[in-house]
Amino acid sequence: LLSVERLHKRFGLHEVLKDVSFSCSPGEIVAIVGPNAAGKSTLGKLLSGLLKEDGGTIRFAEKPLKKSRRRGVIWYIMQDLDSQLFGESLTDELLTGKKETPTLKLRADELLTLLNLAEFADRHPATLSGGQKQRLALAVALLNEAPVIVLDEPTSGLDGRNMRSVSKQLHTLAQKGHIILMITHDLECALATCSRALVIRDGTLADDFQIDDAWRLMAAMRE
């Protein structure tokens, strides 16, 4: 269980997040939606430890997660994927910063196969399509054994086929017990992928509902 309790963040005098609380269970895919500049991406960066909160607590499995420990539990996939990809090949990307062992190499190969990237293992990440880069970023998160994955606009710039491919892979990960949090403005992707929505508005958690009403979700994304 991931739990967020009364999270606060300010930049100078501007309070970006105010008293945000929610929890997520293994297997959930949750959309984080709301207007631009509402605090959604800030929330993602706080969860993953890229930013430090000014108040509140983030817990996983009932234990508080200090900022320094979050990267091993919560993996944040940015909207600008090119800024996260440094390897000379897909395999190299997965193994960057790690001591390569036969077991680790086998796991990397298994993940590339799982995410339909095995045929591109020796290619440079820059040559991949947007959808393929998203799947590579997911593979990196899984190799680091992150039980929680936060994606910031994962379908931005993707065509319908690649969007559906990413959605399918997220469902596969959720079935394996991962918690998926997806910051998105993409109504079609949220409806196809997520079962629940958290609505961030003016830095607060304005709503939290199961996605069984497309009109309610549409209204939340437009306000």
Language-model region placement:
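The feature captures the beta-strand-to-loop junction immediately N-terminal to the Walker
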Residues: 33-35
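Catalytic Walker B motif of ABC-type/P-loop ATPase nucleotide-binding domains
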Residues: 149-152
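Conserved beta-strand-loop-alpha-helix hinge in the C-terminal portion
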Residues: 204-223
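H-loop/switch region of ABC-family ATPase nucleotide-binding domains
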Residues: 184-185
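Conserved ABC ATPase "signature" region
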Residues: 103-120
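Conserved ABC ATPase signature
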Residues: 124-128
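Helix-to-loop junction immediately C-terminal to a conserved catalytic motif
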Residues: 48
